[in-house]
C-alpha cells in the first residue's frame, strides 16, 4: 500500500496542479484506507477504544464507526446505519479469539462525493 501511495505522489510531483489532482486524490484515498485499517487493528488487537483510536488519528469518536465499517476486518460487524459500535468491536474480538471472525459480504468502496447534477 505504501508503495502505491509513493507512486501516486511521484506521479503528481512536477505536474501542473490540474493534472496532479487525480494522483493526489489516489494517494489521499489510499492513506485514508491505511488509517482506517490501522484503526481497525488498534481496536481489535491493541485493545484501544473507538475514542482512543479516533483521537490518535485526529478524528472525533463519531467519525470512527463509519470508517471502521469500511475495513476488511470489521465490515461484517457494521450495523444498519453503516457504523461499527463499541459492542460490535467487543463481538468481533470475541469471534476473533474463538477463531471464527465474520467475513464481509461484499467489497466496500470508500466514501466519495457524488454530484447530484448531471455534468454539463
Language model features by range: what are they?
Residues 62:
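Key DNA-contact positions within bacterial/archaeal DNA-binding proteins
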